[in-house]
Curated annotation (Swiss-Prot):
PANTHER family: AMINOALKYLPHOSPHONATE N-ACETYLTRANSFERASE-RELATED (PTHR43877:SF2), AMINOALKYLPHOSPHONATE N-ACETYLTRANSFERASE-RELATED-RELATED (PTHR43877). Its EC number is 2.3.1.-. Keywords: Acyltransferase, Transferase. This is Acetyltransferase YpeA. Residues 1-141 form the N-acetyltransferase domain.
Length: 141
């Protein structure tokens, strides 16, 4: 397995992977999310590749105060092999190299399988409520 920065050639393969991982939501346009990330620090957008196939992704960010991780997904046929752990580990190292003191990940409360994985990796439940506001409307995907 190789973990590397996203390349433009990965575009369609990544969107297909996100569909298989059930990461897409009607209110997010994945094509726009990728375009925006490519225009703003693509070095924190990582893919895991096995035999030339993209089998995992994580999209990271850093605002100078905290890091974040989005679009963490692993192809169903490749789960249980440590790919998600490796992607997060690489992202964390990149954030630490930038002086990032902490990372935040938003997870649906009912996603017990993923919550357990994050807890095993040292993530803790933060007693905060995540609020959001759409600033630019995307087309429904």
């Amino acid at each position: 397995m190789e973990i590397r920065v996203f390349h433009q050639e990965d575009f369609e393969e990544v969107i297909t992977l996100w569909e298989r991982c059930d990461l897409l939501r009607p209110w997010n346009d994945p094509e726009m999310d990728i375009e925006r990330k490519m225009n703003h620090d693509v070095s924190l957008f990582l893919v895991a590749e096995v035999n030339g196939e993209v089998v995992g992704t994580v999209m990271g960010g850093y605002d100078g105060h905290r890091g974040s991780a989005y679009y963490l997904g692993v192809h169903p046929e490749f789960r249980g092999r440590g790919i998600a752990n490796a992607l997060l580990n690489r992202l964390e190292k990149k954030l630490i190299a930038r002086g990032c003191p902490k990372i935040q990940i938003n997870v649906p409360e009912d996603n017990d399988m993923v919550l357990g994985m994050y807890e095993r990796l040292g993530y803790e439940h933060a007693d905060v409520l995540s609020l959001g506001k759409r600033l630019i409307e995307d087309e429904e995907y």
